[in-house]
A protein has these predicted regions:
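C-terminal accessory regions
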Residues: 76-207
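Conserved helicase/translocase motor-coupling segment
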Residues: 1-76, 125
């Protein structure tokens, strides 16, 4: 993803990413990245919440959209890093649009896992997450530096830069200007391991 400071920048970059891949306005393409924004379930559905969280759908989880589910409002997802990554879940997926107060609702389950688009993420939302490769949007940090804001005795731009840099596990790209190269290949899921997890039966401990 591209890590940014300002939400307006995030929305613009997501729109540019989708336009570069010729994504339709009202639907997601297979392979589009998503970030789980939490589970929206009433208290009485506590067991379902625990089940979704056990499958890896926790706030900040990185997912890949595989397509619509069999039921209305459901989506098939690949949860990155999960032991059993193939999940079919009731989902609320919204994509904010430039110059629009109302987001586009791609999947509108009444309740379930909520998602935001994962092509660009604010440094605030990115805290606690890590990716093999991360892009940092330099112009946003430059604006933060010019504002001269200080938080807890540390210049804001330094705090933002630290969070952004430490999100990268292997590689960091520093973006210096508003430009987006055309993708060399279409979005896809060919690099994901789609093998379903093996079912394992374990005997109960009689002394437990």
């Amino acid at each position: 993803p591209v890590l940014v400071w300002r939400n307006a920048t995030r929305i613009r970059l997501i729109a540019a990413f989708r336009a570069a891949h010729d994504a339709p306005e009202t639907a997601l393409l297979t392979g589009e990245p998503l970030i789980c924004d939490g589970i929206e379930l009433p208290v009485k559905h506590r067991k379902k919440r625990i089940d979704l969280e056990a499958r890896g759908l926790i706030k900040g989880a990185q997912c890949i959209y595989l397509g619509p589910g069999k039921k209305p409002g459901f989506s098939r997802l690949f949860v990155m890093g999960a032991a059993d990554p193939l999940v079919n879940a009731a989902s609320i997926i919204q994509i904010e649009l430039p110059d629009s107060e109302e987001p586009m609702i791609v999947s509108a389950a009444k309740m379930g896992a909520a998602f935001l688009h994962g092509a660009a993420v604010t440094t605030h939302k990115a805290q606690g997450s890590q990716w093999p490769s991360v892009q940092v949007f330099g112009p946003d940090l430059q604006i933060a530096a010019k504002m001269g804001r200080v938080e807890a005795g540390i210049p804001l731009w330094k705090r933002l830069a630290y969070v952004a840099i430490t999100r990268a596990e292997e590689r960091l790209y520093w973006v210096t200007r508003y430009a987006l190269a055309r993708p060399k290949e279409p979005l896809g899921v060919g690099d994901l391991d789609m093998t379903p997890a093996k079912l394992e039966l374990t005997a109960e401990d009689p002394e437990a």
